[in-house]
Amino acid sequence: MYVGRFVTIGKTNGRLWAGYRVSSRSFPNRYAVKLGDDKVAIMPKDVKDLEKSPYISYNCIRVLPSVAVVTNGSHTDAIVEKIEMGYPIRDALALSLLAMDYEKDSLDTPRIAAVVSRHVAYLGIVTKDGLNVSTFPMGDNECLMVATYEKTMFSRLTVDASSAEEVARKMYDLTFEKPVCAAGAYQVDDHFELGVYNGPQ
């Protein structure tokens, strides 16, 4: 099954985590890269690809001391900015998705987002037809996802992880078609660590 890009939220051994994967038929020549300790970006291997689509390069993860934000586009930054301004996480998520709306490409691709903070996680999606944002008080060994295609309703997965790198690797290895690159954020004490995986080298 081809589901496009997707975000996940999970909890393993009392630690929250969030994951992201790029699956792509149109722009497979991309990679995930950590930018410092608080950011992961999706970048094209050929900068000329940016002329073909404005949606292929963005910060897919940003972390604050107690919050990790994971999305499939530039709304990562908008959500973080609203949280920093003092908005409740649910409101920051909903307002950013509503303001930026679905991607205006040939497929009307949804914008999706995940946020994890302390003991609570959030998923959101905005499509051409509507907006859905939900809060999940995560129990141990729980995992949920939402994707841009096919799995656009929040659904459960069976995934556990013990590090950010393992989150990224497990996102990449899920059986959905056309994996390109993946990233993860994993709660360690009072902060989040970041990991990326760009497939077999």
UniProtKB/Swiss-Prot annotation:
General function of this protein: Catalyzes the cyclization of 5-formylamidoimidazole-4-carboxamide ribonucleotide to IMP.
Signal peptide positions (record): none
HAMAP family named in the record: IMP_cyclohydrol
Family membership: Belongs to the archaeal IMP cyclohydrolase family.
Enzyme class: hydrolase
Gene for this chain: purO
Recorded superkingdom: Archaea
Disulfide-bond pairs as recorded: none
One Pfam entry name: IMP_cyclohyd
Name listed for the protein in its UniProt record: IMP cyclohydrolase
Keywords from the named record: Hydrolase, Purine biosynthesis
